[in-house]
């Protein structure tokens, strides 16, 4: 017992700084638990306790500086017009959208099939091939009807699966979306079906955009991530997409110690090919039929990828060239735009204008739109570089490139359509997105409540993608079956196999 006469007891200091509290999930049973946000050295961790499964910790960011900097970017949210479920169990168990959700959907992600021609160890969704689900035309009609009714404009729709190119009516679905007034039609694919040039030609005629999952250039790494060697096939597919001028995004899932050393090579590929519009890096997430059993040493965070990019580019791009998305929670996306200079080379947009300007240009869109605000920013950059030509080494080439772009995008003799401007601007200004998906271990209710990416339902509902993948897809018999759920149970770290 402490003797009061001897003074107060010596204080024992913790090895972390307590920053705040959020709501998360138990990594085993997925029950809601409190998560203390702790700064440990220069990293950010969630510290959780589940009454049934004990103490759990997970890293959520490898840089306190980035974590706090991202939170300094604040933008207003636009709640969804349609609420389909009441608040009952509390977020994230009432999706959706429920009255707690703070952001309308800007990117509807529509899984049109559960069929897939790969069984990837990194797959973070659930897909059954036996008795595979194929979305009907009627179901898509209902979904599109709700999307159009609930939004002033739907700029983009993404088709996913499974493997969406295995749906026999995918071209028809694209035509339906175009008829509904949707401008950007994207297909997330592993690319194997795109070996068929006639099929690529058909998609090109529909002005479809391809989001190609290219994770590595090494066959042995591809087997670790995808369970197959698809590298040559995907590079051949990229050549076909270039031949038919199909706008393409390269989407790698990045795992620490597996393929994170290839981020620079993937960025070089994107910058070198005119038809490749962007690079979207997804952090490895440990949920779904494959990801739940993947080694946890592969967890990587947004600041880790900033460092890989900075190292690969020799500092030509660093973390301060990125900003969060104004549409989402600041810790979900990190976005960098680069101006591709005439004659080769590039300069990050944030070095020509301020990060605040870049954040403002993104506004209420997933992308910088080539509209009048961008025209004014380009003119401001010209004025700034004329006044301070030594501010960046490439001043003369930047001036020449921006002047040409201004003439191409905003000619004095006629007004271009937004689609015409997009095609011009996307070849000159490329984007690097880092998207931090969540699993049951690093789940953050504060993030999911602001999610602008949703899985639309036939009844008009919309479920945020991370909630959908972690909590809801496994309950949907169109995508999940008992065998798949059992495999997920026994491959989870620390799990004990039980009979089906």
Task: Describe the role of every protein-language-model region.
Residues 1, 232, 243-426:
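Radical SAM enzyme [4Fe-4S]-AdoMet core and its adjacent flexible, acidic
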Residues 1-82, 339-500:
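Radical SAM enzyme core and accessory elements
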Residues 42-62, 66, 72-189, 193-198:
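Conserved alpha-helical substructure of the radical SAM core
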Residues 45, 107, 209, 249, ...:
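Broad gene-expression machinery/nucleic-acid interaction feature
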Residues 50, 89-98, 106, 116, ...:
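Functionally engaged cysteine thiol sites
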Residues 126-130, 217-220, 286-287:
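A short, flexible beta-alpha/helix-coil linker loop
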Residues 126-134, 223-230, 294-295:
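Short glycine-enriched, charge-decorated loop/helix-capping segments at active-site entrances
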Residues 141-158, 167-284:
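Radical SAM/AdoMet-radical enzyme domain recognition
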